[in-house]
Amino acid sequence: RQALCYVSGLIISTFAQSPLAHQFLELIIGFGIAGTGMGMILAVVGRASSEKNRSMALGIVTAAGSVGQMVGAPLAQFLLNLYEWQQVFIIFAFSIVLVMTVVPLLKETPVSSKKEIEVSLTKVVGNAFKDPNFSMIFLGFFACGYQLAFVSAHFPAMVTEMCSAISPSSLLHYFGVSTTSGLGALAIALIGFSNIFGTIYAGWLGQKFPKKYLLAIVYALRTLTVSYTHL
């Protein structure tokens, strides 16, 4: 269902005629991503891993997700150079459909009966927020997600607007980056490339030091870095 929500959001977005319509449809896409993205994958890996290896396992899985960021941004820009943005949305929606065809082939793990696991969402959320530890983690990951979304949405546009035209004789042009929008996509890809090594290293550190302090340091350094870049 979540994947269908993701696909539907992408397809319907091709008919959007205003920024407000795009923002509304982004909510639908967001619901789809919430049920199919890295958050769900990390939860599964976290439960399946032992306490000793959990931190490193999560780091490796996150690094694999960064490979998608490294490849996805330049691929999207390449497709935008060939097709209209509506067609690119359809292409990505079709790629999600292809992944969905593989899901029935995966072996399901036996779960508890529906009666045993059926709990209202209101009760689950209420119990979670009664725990101060969850509230602190929630605020931390809210800041993390906000920063990631902000960088992903605005950093390529900032690079596109602030950089001058790329010279045909430049090294960038030689490697196929001929426009400032292409340079913006490359910038996001470089962030993903760096994140591959950063998340694996963070996973290793998580096996050696308290994770809450590591998270605090990572978030603080990211905030300072983004602030310095803005200035």
Q: What annotation goes with each model-predicted range?
A:
Residues R1-A3, K208-Y219:
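Cytoplasmic membrane-interface "Motif A"-like loop-to-helix N-cap segments
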Residues G9, L20-I28:
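Paired small-residue
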Residues I29-A63:
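Cytoplasmic helix-loop-helix junction between adjacent transmembrane helices
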Residues V61, G65-L105:
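Helix-loop-helix hairpin linking two adjacent transmembrane segments in secondary transporters
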Residues S112-F134:
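Juxtamembrane intracellular "pre-TM" segments in multi-pass secondary transporters
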Residues N133-A189:
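Extracytoplasmic gate region of multi-pass secondary transporters
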Residues T199-P210:
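Helix-to-loop junctions at the C-terminal end of transmembrane segments
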Residues T229-H230:
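Conserved small/polar residues in nucleotide/adenosyl-binding loops
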